[in-house]
Amino acid sequence: MAAAPLYCVCRQPYDVNRFMIECDICKDWFHGSCVQVVEHHAADIDVYHCPNCEPIHGPYMMKKHNNWHRHDYTEPNDGTRPVQAGTAVFVKELQARSFASGDILVQMQGNQVTKRFLEKEGFNYPIVVHDLDGLGLKLPPPSFSVSDVEHYVGANKVIDVIDVAKQADSKMKLGEFVKYYYQPERPKVLNVISLEFSDTRMSNLVVVPDIAQKMSWVENYWPDDSFFPKPFVQKYCLMGMKNSYTDFHIDFGGTSVWYHVLWGEKIFYLIKPTKANLALYEAWSSSPNQSEVFFGEKVDKCYKCVVKQGTTILLPTGWIHAVLTSQDSMAFGGNFLHNLNIDMQLRCYEMERRLKTPDLFKFPYFEAICWYVAKNLLETLKELRENKCEAQGFLVNGVKALISSLKMWLRRELTQPNSEVPDNIRPGHLIKALSKEIRHLEDDSNKAVKTQGSAECSLSRSTLEKGDQAQQAARRLQDHHHHRRRHHHHHHHHHHHHHHHHSRKLPSNLDVLELHTLEVLKRLEVGQLKEDSAFSSKVNGKFKKVCPVPAAAVEASHDNALRLVMCNGKIIRERMPITNVAATVNAVEMYHKHRIKLERIPMCPEEKVKKEKCEDEFGVQCTIKKPVSQGESVQTELRTESPHLASSDSDSKAGDSAEKCSLESESSDGEDGGSQRDSGTFVEHLNSHRHSHHKQALKRERPTSPNTDCAIQGMLSMAGLLCPQASGGAADILQQRWWASQGNGSSTSSSSDMWDSSEPCSAPRSPDAEDGSLGEEYSYRESSLSPPLHPSKRHAPNPTPVSNQATKGKRPKKGQATAKQRLGKILKMSRHKGLFLMKPMVFLIPQQGGTPLDPQFLLQSSSICVFPPPLIVSG
């Protein structure tokens, strides 16, 4: 094998990393360092004579300056060629131009520039910070000089130097640049803008701003065991001579920039990276006469920003900018990729590829870091979804753009072998996983939008119909503190969503009973119940909303306004002030005396919600017991339901817990007659006593006619309507009970398109609910806004049976109903979890009673029992 040719006076082979110059006489090549010719100076030599030829042919000859406005100053100055960027003439013209003021700059304090602020407000405009305090940036003192840079970095450090007049890049040692910088006369303007010193001793003198450190992809996502070398782009030292100029450009990879002028002055010419401006920039960059066209004139606005000594500027992603050094300056800066503008960063990178930008001016291993970022963002999205946190918009948009770029890079690898996919990453699997997470986010976002949209409609409905419940709760709370008052005042309740007041008057007990009676008569086809026009006008579709319970209702739940014991339709005990302990003692006494067994009802959260809600609204719960064969009995409610529900065998089993919690009733054809007669009796009574009870809550005094008033109170108790309702909304609230029970039946029922459904719940009752308070899981599930249908015309749901430990082994056999039934067929066990089957000789101890109950009442309590949610009595 032939030996490599030797060159230069040193007789060394060719070294690609060393600058060499050819002798025009002997045609031999010489190292610039061996013949004392620097690279940037060689371009000005017209004819070079090596040291061997110089004694014979004389010294080398330099080029003549024919013009001062062209990169090639040897061109004739005939005035026909335009001015090129960077030349002396260009700089003078640039300083004379007028630009838009830098009013787009965001003036901030150092402690205000935080990651949270940028994530919330966005990083779309340049930020100027005049004080270093709070920015986290540490730099050498302003007395730090170019020679100090040489001391910390090293004189032999090879750096890239730009000849400003020619806009040409060349390499030289740092020591040579420093020597040239301190010359009294500098024939050329040299600019150093790419001295990265992270691997030098000077790195210890500089600490990058906190915002750049916390947001940087390299610092946060680049693994230590990466096959690719870690990019160092965070610490640059820029040393520029006066009149140095860098033409318009976008920093590599669309990186953002932090820039601090240690001493001197810099002038930035800024252009916003709009789509139009980016398209113009790409066309301008690829044009052959790029240096002859000032890009600032091609866009709508170009802003001028003067950065003086001690000032820091942060440039966002993609901003097109040029820099003029108006005086000798030293500055420190750095570049960083981040999550805020992923889309723009990728667009800038693809633009660099289309423009065939040399690797020297591109972000090192840009594609590799994008793969690392994609892997980490996948984990971030998973955590957000698992924690049920909403992903920020910039992150979602960035991941979408990243997925598109990753797919494109994979396709490009089929034809281009230079892959930057890390070895420990499965690209196809990663892209699929990211796409899946994005789909989850979009699905959740669509659900959130629907929920938000329905919230407005539901809250509007709540304002008109359900807002009255908050009024009722407030009234009960006031009654508890002022129970000796004979009259109640009407109060305004401030709705916590809509922030406006309701001033509607509350109806009396007779009004409520009349509305309910008319409702029952309509279902029995005796009379028609007119739909509320205000409600019907708002029925536009189906909405779902889970509304929080008003605060007044929560407080009122701790002290239930009323506890009644009824027998044969008469109120035996009313509002007896006895504690829970006293009630328990009474229960024990009743157990020993009458062999009555007390049980506590385990309730799921949803059952507790509806149970306590009904209790807060109406004050009591009532059941109608009907003896059947063998002394067993079942319960029914005042309301009726479609007949075909009674024939379902599945309804006799343990039903859905959500349905059991609702207050719903069923009726049979054979019982319509009796119900009709009883209802008619109460309608007559309502018409005669309505005005005497108007605008009054439940009376605390002995009525004038005990038998009549007891009958009214009994019907109210059986209907669950003892608490006064708001005028105009009572009928709607009554109807809503049926909606809640119908909708909570089963998610697979045939009527699921019209009525809401909820998941069955079997969680035990919380301790807070046992003492009359509301648990944390208390929520009100608003029904669909579908128009209310007549109960006999609605389709019955097919509830899914749910096992309930409290009801196992206690279901009575179906038997013949008694002759004393009043308003409906027997209520099946599957329809009410909180109402249990009891024998005729059973009563309930009130939760807040007064004096112990007379055992004589046991002989009369054969049809009606009123009991609080926590306790039931069974024989």
UniProtKB/Swiss-Prot annotation:
Binds 1 Fe(2+) ion per subunit. Residues 650-663 have a biased composition (Basic and acidic residues). InterPro entries: JHD (IPR041070), JHDM1_Histone_Demethylase (IPR050690), JmjC_dom (IPR003347), Zinc_finger_PHD-type_CS (IPR019786), Znf_FYVE_PHD (IPR011011), Znf_PHD (IPR001965), Znf_PHD-finger (IPR019787). Substrate binds at residues 246, 266. Predominantly expressed in brain. Residues 448-462 have a biased composition (Polar residues). It holds the Pfam family PHD. One of its GO terms (molecular function) is histone H3K27me2/H3K27me3 demethylase activity. Keywords: Chromatin regulator, Dioxygenase, Iron, Metal-binding, Neurogenesis, Nucleus, Oxidoreductase, Transcription, Transcription regulation, Zinc, Zinc-finger. Residues 742-762 have a biased composition (Low complexity). PROSITE patterns: JMJC (PS51184), ZF_PHD_1 (PS01359), ZF_PHD_2 (PS50016). Its EC number is 1.14.11.-. The keyword Zinc applies. Its cofactor is Fe(2+). Residues 442-506, 629-710, 742-820 are annotated as: Disordered. Residues 478-505, 688-697 have a biased composition (Basic residues). GO terms for cellular component: nucleus. A zinc finger (PHD-type) spans 5-56. CDD domains: PHD_KDM7. One of its GO terms (biological process) is chromatin remodeling. It comes from the Eukaryota. The PHD-type zinc finger mediates the binding to H3K4me3. Binding to H3K4me3 prevents its access to H3K9me2. Histone demethylase required for brain development. Specifically demethylates dimethylated 'Lys-9' and 'Lys-27' (H3K9me2 and H3K27me2, respectively) of histone H3 and monomethylated histone H4 'Lys-20' residue (H4K20Me1), thereby playing a central role in histone code. Belongs to the JHDM1 histone demethylase family. JHDM1D subfamily. This is Lysine-specific demethylase 7A. The lineage of its organism: Eukaryota, Metazoa, Chordata, Craniata, Vertebrata.
